[in-house]
Amino acid sequence: MSYAAIPYYIMIILTAILYYILPKKIRWIALLISSGYFYDSVSDNRVQLMIFGISILAGYTCGIFIKKGHDRQYGDIASKCILTTGIVVSVLPLVVSKCGDLLLVSVLHKSSAGWILPVGLSFYSMQTVAYLTDIYHGKIEPQKNILKYTLFITFFPLIIQGPISRYDQLGEQLFEGHSYDDRQIMRGIQLILWGWELKYLIADKAAIFVNAVFDNYQIYSGLFILIAGILYSIQLYTDFLSCVTISQGVSELFGIKLTDNFRHPYFSVSIKEFWRRWHMSLSAWLRDYVYIPLGGNRRGKIRKYMNLIITFAVSGLWHGGRWKYIFWGLLHAFYQIAGEILEKPVNFILEKASLPKGSKMRKFVEMVFTSFLVMNAWIIFRAESLKAGAKMIRSMFSMFNPWILFDNSLFRLGLCQKEFEVLFLAVLLLTAVSALQEKGIKIREWFNRQNMLIRWTIYLCSIWIIWIFGTYGFGFNSADFIYGGF
């Protein structure tokens, strides 16, 4: 059962009915039942469920005993040992998976036995580490009810692709029991519809062209690679954003508000800013639980740069046990270090080129350049291997073939002209919406102030557009959410 499947939404409707029928104090039980059912339905075997159950039990038990250690029943040394044990048990399957993949792919050119690993491992492991660490530092109290703790870890809109939620942000929202609110329900539906549009009108369409080029990269060069790189940058963003948006919408049906995971990352004027806008829950987790514990920027520039390299290497390994992912992470570390070292000379050159800091043209140039750097890293990320990614980037610069824009070559890679037009218009709409939000305009508030006729006309038109021009429009099926594979 995936977030794009009809049974998923049938489950949501049944869950919502049960949730609002139950007394407020026990409404969280409806979420727990559905979360358990959903996780069981997406798991391939009982071994996965057993590993997942051990992780939940370890996280819950260690949280209780860490707190008791702070209350001087066991002492601080014991608390540290318990914290370490809880973290090791939580992340060991993840480390074994990623490092095992890295070893087997490098040496034997085979993949590890990923079939035994629990679904959502990369996300709930980080959530557990944050939970235990925050208890140790006294930021939160441990959850004493194991069923409530289980709900925190397994909450079904989050378990596959996040966002990675902290207990102090999510915990009480899950357990308090929210009142039924028509407006809240409609706000949730708005987000779900917007998520569908991002997925079916942009991400899935872009995937067709992207797959055609990346799967046969040896025969393409020049603008073919550039366009595929741009479209993959858009595909990955809208695919992940759509899943998070749908998750936020589903959660709002129950009165639960999830943290945002993106803030228009391709409007960034530097790589540093990009990581403040991209996958924000992961960026915050890496900052708080890897970068800062390593010393952050408090111990001189050399140590700061080493900490950045380690942090981004961890980020790369988190995405997968392949050298291409680690190189992708290290490349972003290099971008940040180079950006900081070269900031003054670059600023001097741009000032001399009549591009003063703060000017619109300067911002545009920096946005384009940052997006180009990010796109090159995404090519490595998407390619079948590090070697293939490097070859694609070389091929992109090896030939200038502008004629493909006019001889219909682009329309022979899975997308006809009409599909390209739909994709272009959908990206244009996303860009316009993002630009308005960037200026502080709250589109949903404006929308909710309109009369019922206008609102329902937009709802029905959105569904019609998705139905005609999205998944069903030209005979192709929805692809899996990309980040579900990490």
Predicted feature descriptions by range:
Residues 1-431, 435-485:
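Membrane-embedded transmembrane alpha-helical bundles that form the catalytic cores
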